[in-house]
């Protein structure tokens, strides 16, 4: 059962062509973890999306999506942030779009610990401050704002799939948490 919202303008490949491409090529993605920061730039809250997996389970995840042909990384980030968080989220993209890490997903378990059963994907992962009102859309059922300590709790970490809990820990370590 597929619970994903169909993209009315997929931008580059039909579903059949995408399936064939995923079997042959790594897909390029952006992933964004929305955060709220204090006046000194320290992360106060982490925004985690809740959505239903293809198996019907409730899982935590991040803003994520493919980079389309001839689309810049910055444009892909903005498009997916608006698609998942709404047009009033007001994301603050950094002057230089350098990711905190490059995440490699494989269709079966690998040394990276990240899995995506659909494909081999390479994701540029970002922490993105947002200052506006977020209204989760598309596949997301809700957006929960948690303190970094809450987001790192075992109960929240257990709600991630595909190794994304480790990616969240890495993101917060990059922002100075867990030292």
Which residues fall in each region the model found?
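Acidic, metal-coordinating catalytic segment for phosphate/diphosphate chemistry
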Residues: 1-39, 115-116
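A structural signal for short, well-ordered beta-strand segments
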Residues: 32, 77, 81, 126-128
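A structural signal for the main folded, soluble domain(s) of proteins
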Residues: 33, 37-38, 43, 82, ...
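Conserved Nudix-box catalytic region and its N-terminal flanking loop in Nudix hydrolases
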Residues: 41-90
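Nudix hydrolase/Nudix homology domain
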Residues: 55-60, 119, 125-179
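Active-site segment of metal-dependent pyrophosphate-handling enzymes
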Residues: 86-134
């Amino acid at each position: 059962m597929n619970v994903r919202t169909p993209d009315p303008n997929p931008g580059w490949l039909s579903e059949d062509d995408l399936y064939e491409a995923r079997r042959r090529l790594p897909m390029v993605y952006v992933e964004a973890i929305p955060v709220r920061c204090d006046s000194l730039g320290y992360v106060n809250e982490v925004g985690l999306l809740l959505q239903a997996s293809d198996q019907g389970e409730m899982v935590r995840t991040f803003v994520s999506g493919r980079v389309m042909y001839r689309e810049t990384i910055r444009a892909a980030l903005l498009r997916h942030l608006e698609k998942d968080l709404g047009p009033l989220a007001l994301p603050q993209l950094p002057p230089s779009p350098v990711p905190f890490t490059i995440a490699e997903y494989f269709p079966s378990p690998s040394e990276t610990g990240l899995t995506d059963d659909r494909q081999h994907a390479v994701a540029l992962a970002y922490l993105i401050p947002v200052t506006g009102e977020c209204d989760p859309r598309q596949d997301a059922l809700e957006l929960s704002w948690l303190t970094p300590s809450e987001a790192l709790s075992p109960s929240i970490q257990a709600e991630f799939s595909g190794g994304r809990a480790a990616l969240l820990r890495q993101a917060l370590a990059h922002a100075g948490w867990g030292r």
